[in-house]
Amino acid sequence: MSKLKLNPYFGEYGGMYVPQILVPALKQLETAFVEAQEDDDFKAEFTDLLKNYAGRPTALTLTRNLSPNPMVKIYLKREDLLHGGAHKTNQVLGQALLAKRMGKKEIIAETGAGQHGVATALACALLGLKCKVYMGAKDVARQSPNVFRMRLMGAEVIPVTSGSATLKDACNEAMRDWSGSYEKAHYLLGTAAGPHPFPTIVREFQRIIGEETKKQMLEREGRLPDAVIACVGGGSNAIGMFADFIDEPSVELIGVEPAGKGIDTPMHGAPLKHGKTGIFFGMKAPLMQDSEGQIEESYSISAGLDFPSVGPQHAHLNATGRARYESATDDEALEAFQQLARCEGIIPALESAHAIAYAVKMARECTKETILVVNLSGRGDKDIFTVSDILNGKEV
């Protein structure tokens, strides 16, 4: 059996905990990725798609009215302006190109909020690949606009009714499908989690977020920000923002997990701060589990953060202290969702609203000149019906 070319671990986290039948597929994927990263033609095609199809670089917007503190500037990295409406498009284009390079004809994906599903559907339509998306039945119900978008672009959307009928279960079904079809299909995983080499692949295809932010900050302010802030579910938008700043010790890295109804309740999705290490979804990582080691259901108002585990690099950054991880409740995210709309005329995704909420809270407590950058990971079109129902007093 050939050796791995990349380190599958981040400290103690990560690995490749999958059925033996999938090991050759993952090794083939790793080899293809390493070769593609060294291929100038592949890199040129990926860069061209990001620029001329997806619309990069995205803007870095200085908010005019959001900061509650005159000493604090809050910038937004505008991934909401990317084609598809969220950061997901970056790495999906990369993986879809990689799948074509490997000769795959079909794409299997999972989705929570539907943003990864939409991004996968658009990439498959563009590149002529068959597309199958697994989505928890609960998420199908609460994200109907994205379900329609996926189907409009030719994707087959498969509702998953097992378990909690959310992202965790969609991930399991997608992995199960891939186990029987990997010779012709590529599993296009949507976050920086799962078995090696997915966390590394997703990070590398998302790191453009932080690279652009660093360049734009130096142009605008002549210095790096004091902190970069991003919401964390599986963790792809956050690792995309963090990656280029990890070796910049002056820049604080802050991830914001969903506290749901409250960290002191069972209704949250914060495994980094309140989970225990376990094996899930092909990786060793912090995991929400009960005293018997069974996976507990996560909860968040935002479907894209409703995940009981987290990517292994985030676990490592937390363990080493290089990044810190905070949380924001549903109520705080809802308030930030409305605040950004009213203050700046920008409607954020509920996922991104968690990061906005923490940034405003942090700004309030700053006692010196400070620059914060929030990764506005997606736009809020998909969430307006959910938020409208809540504000009108309906149960969601």
From Swiss-Prot:
Keywords: Amino-acid biosynthesis, Aromatic amino acid biosynthesis, Lyase, Pyridoxal phosphate, Tryptophan biosynthesis. InterPro entries: Trp_synth_b_CS (IPR006653), Trp_synth_beta (IPR006654), Trp_synth_beta/beta-like (IPR023026), TrpB-like_PALP (IPR001926), TrpB-like_PALP_sf (IPR036052). It comes from the Bacteria. Its cofactor is pyridoxal 5'-phosphate. It is an enzyme of class 4 (lyase). Its EC number is 4.2.1.20. Pathway: Amino-acid biosynthesis; L-tryptophan biosynthesis; L-tryptophan from chorismate: step 5/5. The modification N6-(pyridoxal phosphate)lysine is found at residue 88. One of its GO terms (molecular function) is tryptophan synthase activity. The keyword NADP does not apply. It catalyses: (1S,2R)-1-C-(indol-3-yl)glycerol 3-phosphate + L-serine = D-glyceraldehyde 3-phosphate + L-tryptophan + H2O. GO terms for cellular component: cytoplasm. The keyword Amino-acid biosynthesis applies. It holds the Pfam family PALP. The beta subunit is responsible for the synthesis of L-tryptophan from indole and L-serine. Tetramer of two alpha and two beta chains. Belongs to the TrpB family. This is Tryptophan synthase beta chain. The gene is trpB.
